[in-house]
From Swiss-Prot:
It catalyses: L-cysteine + L-glutamate + ATP = gamma-L-glutamyl-L-cysteine + ADP + phosphate + H(+). ATP-dependent carboxylate-amine ligase which exhibits weak glutamate--cysteine ligase activity. One of its GO terms (molecular function) is ATP binding. This is Putative glutamate--cysteine ligase 2. Its EC number is 6.3.2.2. NCBIfam families: gshA_cyan_rel, PRK13517.1-2, PRK13517.1-4. It comes from the Bacteria. The keyword ATP-binding applies. It comes from Corynebacterium diphtheriae (strain ATCC 700971 / NCTC 13129 / Biotype gravis). One of its GO terms (biological process) is modified amino acid biosynthetic process. Keywords: ATP-binding, Ligase, Nucleotide-binding. It holds the Pfam family GCS2. Belongs to the glutamate--cysteine ligase type 2 family. YbdK subfamily.
Length: 359
């Protein structure tokens, strides 16, 4: 893989879906929105989905403003079609068996290969790209970012419902997506050469021929970025906080390397446990924070991160967005709001209404 060095620029991909405000079910008309929009939109795996894609941005506010303008256009087009826009990690009752995949050879091949699990990918996420100055820094930074996996997932967890039930998870999307053979946690490679050898193996074995790429939760890209794919899709306010935290964390890690500091890491088994805890318990997760298996509440860790990173956030122009992390800690994440409504009403319909209203 070619990896061109990049300054710490930023790009964001935001997956959203179309919903019928009467039935509250999903509607496979994403291609119609894309055809009418001037905003940069991409087709995604599902025909009900559109993906908003920013340009290469220098600051979080710049990226968020592009997304704000884009989502307003998408909402207006959807409204003309009698539809609304859905932004969450999954849908609480839409039948994945009845939601068609986009007609694209790559996607159809994934379905053919993965069968039952591939058909269940009724999920949406947020992908954040941050530029990295050297390919030799990519894997130290990715391995360090894995220590912050539960922080980012808990903030955005928005998929408690699935197939008509409360799963008990904050992010059922996370549990579903890892069922695909090329998805899930990356291996903690120790060098760029080791990564290239791994990718050569995947090419030789035909894995990449079937899937187009590896779909790790954090991965390098040919654009000179590290792509963080941890977060559930959610509303723009909570997305802004997660993007700001991601940008600050990666820039902070780059600067630690500049100073010759060793970056934090966790054992693979701790990383996997933290991922599960955040998916299960969200903002109520107790997470592992050291190689000695010390633990802390994810909300306490988030507050500490905001305090530590706030000076850097001012420098990067995303101080206000980073403070949104504290708001989520105080008022709750999307999955908590959804679950509270479901427990109160016993129905997913008002839950869908509430999520649609947040857009």
């Amino acid at each position: 893989m070619i990896f061109p060095p990049s300054p710490p620029t930023l790009g964001v991909e935001w997956e959203v879906a179309l919903a019928d405000p009467h039935s509250r079910d999903l509607v496979p008309r994403g291609h119609e929105v894309i055809e009418k929009a001037t905003t940069h939109l991409e087709r995604e795996f599902l025909a009900n989905t559109v993906e908003l894609v920013t340009s290469v941005c220098t600051t979080v506010p710049e990226a968020i403003e592009e997304l704000r303008e884009g989502i307003e256009e998408v909402k207006a087009i959807a409204a003309d079609m009698g539809l609304k826009v859905w932004a969450a990690g999954s849908h609480p009752f839409s039948d994945f068996r009845k939601q068609p995949v986009n007609e694209k050879g790559h996607y159809n091949e994934i379905i053919e290969r993965t069968q039952y699990w591939g058909n269940q990918m009724l999920i949406w996420g947020i992908h954040v790209h941050v530029g990295i100055s050297s390919k030799d820094r990519v894997w130290p930074i990715i391995n360090a970012m894995l220590t912050y996996y539960p922080h980012l997932l808990a903030l955005t967890a928005s998929s408690p419902g699935w197939d008509g039930i409360d799963t008990g998870y904050a992010s059922n999307r996370t549990m579903l997506y890892q069922q695909l053979p090329t998805a899930g946690l990356p291996y903690q490679f120790q060098s760029w050469d080791e990564w290239e050898a791994y990718m050569a193996d995947q090419n030789k074995s035909g894995v990449i021929n079937h899937t187009g790429s590896m779909h790790f939760d954090i991965r390098p890209t040919r654009y000179g970025t590290v792509e963080v794919r941890i977060c559930d899709s959610t509303n723009l306010r909570e997305l802004s906080a997660a993007v700001a935290l991601t940008h600050c964390l990666i820039v902070d890690l780059e600067r630690k390397l500049d100073r010759g500091e060793e970056l934090p890491t966790l054992q693979d088994w701790h990383v996997a446990e933290n991922k599960w805890r955040a998916a299960r318990y969200g903002m109520d997760a107790e997470i592992i924070i050291s190689r000695d298996t010390d633990e802390a509440w994810v909300t306490d860790e988030l507050r500490s991160l905001v305090e530590r990173l706030s000076p850097l956030a001012r420098e990067l122009g995303c101080y206000d967005e980073l403070q949104g992390v504290l708001t989520i800690c105080q008022t709750g994440a999307s999955y908590q709001r959804q679950r509270a409504i479901y427990k109160e009403t016993g129905s997913w319909l008002p839950v869908v209404d509430a999520v649609l209203a947040e857009m």
